[in-house]
Amino acid sequence: MKQYEYFAANYRTDKKRLKRQFAHDMVALLENENASIQDMRLGRKALKAQYKADKKALKKESKRLEKSFRKDFGMLRRPIMADIFDFFEEDRAVPNGKTPFNDEIKIEKDIVYKTVDGKQLVMDVYYPSRPIAGKAPCVMDIPGGGWMIHNRLRRDGYARCFAAMGAVVAVIDHRLCPEVFFPRDLEDCVDAYNFLCDNAERFGIDKDNITVTGDSSGGHLTMCLGIAATDPEYANSLGIPTTQTKPAGLICVSGAFSFEVMYRIPLTNTLIVRYVSGQKSRKAFRNWQFYKQSDPYNYLNSNLPPCYNSGGMTDFLCMGEAKRMSDALTKAGVKNEYTVGKNLFRSDHCYVLRFPFAPARKDALALYNWYFRLEKDLGVDMSKGFKRVETFMMQYKKALKGEIEC
């Protein structure tokens, strides 16, 4: 059971116990043959009043115990933003996952890559239906969700398009805030990457050709993983392992890179940032042990692989981060490209993952085109697979109806 669920579960159990006791006492009162009608009325009224008072006292005591426990162990409540993310992500999951490749691409689900504190961390692996010659390139996807939620199935369409191009795609889980704080989530991502390297033969991949991608908080972890892979001192300062190989590329979709930037935005400050580090104020955050390391801007280096950043003009969670990161990468001597969506209504947070909308497909195609060119530079021909994805993106409705072949 997750820490934030413990007290709620116990409260529900105790409330059910009270209800059963109330029902038992009411039955006993009604079955008492010696009680008069007046006694029954008074008894029923007294039992109801006692039941109501006991429920109120139970709720108060449960909250008191939870507050005391969280204070002693430095825990934070599961933030309301996590529930908001859950609601919207679940609503978008089905339409975003519709592609003409759904029936042909095989998925190996729930592959355990790590067990920590009794919890199994897993990944889903997508295999291309039309493999390219030789070992396949690999794409490792870190789903976003404010570092607080993630669901591998919600990146299904995004992953299938990479697989349709000819890549083996691994969509991973990692531990979440506020149960753990940075850099434990980054450590899980590095371990997932190394698991793919250790099992390259099993998955049929080239461990020297793994591209890492992530959206929102996953974009942040993607960039931090790239830094850990190219700067051993950074990994050592966090107490995490480095990657066995250098990633071939990094793709960040609406990457939430800088907590300093997010602290300036009231929405992200109140609902997200404090839960990532466990620090409730900006002053406390700046004194946090991993304050400097949590911001990838502080550690960009010329050894980073080629990078691609996608952002939206109306992204109020990570406004301007795609261009800001691109400028910083260029200054550090890193080959990179970026795209910022300009559509007033369809350029919000992680909009490129929403394939039903034409502006999203246009910029998603630019992302897949960048990956196609990256692999071409590495000597991998994905032209046939990219053509299939291009046809799908440009003729979306006809492709889904089967009127044209992808």
Q: Each PLM stretch: what is its role?
A:
Residues 45, 52, 64-406:
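Alpha/beta-hydrolase superfamily serine-hydrolase fold, recognizing
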